[in-house]
């Protein structure tokens, strides 16, 4: 069997990275319809706590440096899962799939990133305060500044786990099966060939046109 590790950023993507993840899902779904000898499934992760590139190691470094701890927006939220939860999702999905399924983990309520920053500062023995800019902070004893830097291009205030509205339960109480749109292999191959040609010629306009034509719900 083959398991694609996808991301919640594939759901109604607002940037090219998220769009590429949704395209990878479509490729797996299309090949699954071809009744191959291999079972294919897809698992969507939120943020994995403690993994390389996650926000917690970044915040730890910023706190150790005396701040500021940088957050892009005071209302931004993200879903989080632990490394054991992520590993369990992959293993369980491989066991449950009938090929072409998209699995997501019930990760509970999303967490405000600014609240995570505050809690990490507190657990490190400091108090937080807010600074207008990351480069102009007031140095206060036992205090760490939090700086709101503004949303990056293509960054969402909140992530979604499902494109469709009717997830199906599975035998695992915390794993759902998503009902997502797919595309047949011939149509997908046609679009991907055009996309490859547009990338090779650096034709940005055509690239975005193709991303909008594919069933990604791309909103850049």
List the predicted regions and their residue ranges.
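Conserved Rossmann-fold NAD(P)-dependent oxidoreductase catalytic core, especially the SDR/UDP-sugar
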Residues: 1-25, 30
């Amino acid at each position: 069997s083959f398991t694609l590790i996808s991301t919640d950023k594939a759901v109604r993507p607002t940037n090219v990275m998220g769009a590429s993840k949704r395209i990878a899902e479509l490729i797996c779904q299309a090949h699954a319809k071809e009744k191959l000898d291999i079972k294919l499934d897809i698992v969507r992760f939120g943020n994995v706590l403690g993994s390389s590139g996650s926000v917690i190691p970044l915040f730890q470094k910023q706190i150790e440096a005396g701040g500021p701890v940088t957050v892009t927006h005071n209302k931004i939220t993200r879903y989080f899962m632990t490394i054991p939860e992520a590993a369990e999702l992959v293993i369980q999905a491989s066991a449950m799939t009938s090929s072409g399924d998209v699995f997501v983990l019930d990760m509970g309520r999303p967490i405000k990133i600014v609240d995570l920053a505050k809690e990490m500062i507190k657990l490190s023995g400091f108090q937080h305060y807010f600074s207008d800019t990351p480069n102009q902070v007031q140095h206060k004893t036992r205090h760490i500044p939090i700086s709101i830097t503004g949303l990056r291009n293509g960054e969402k205030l909140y992530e979604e786990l499902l494109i469709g509205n009717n997830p199906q339960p599975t035998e695992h109480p915390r794993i759902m099966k998503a009902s997502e749109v797919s595309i047949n292999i011939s149509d997908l191959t046609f679009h991907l060939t055009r996309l490859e040609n547009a990338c090779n010629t650096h034709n940005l306009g055509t690239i975005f046109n193709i991303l909008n034509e594919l069933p990604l719900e791309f909103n850049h």
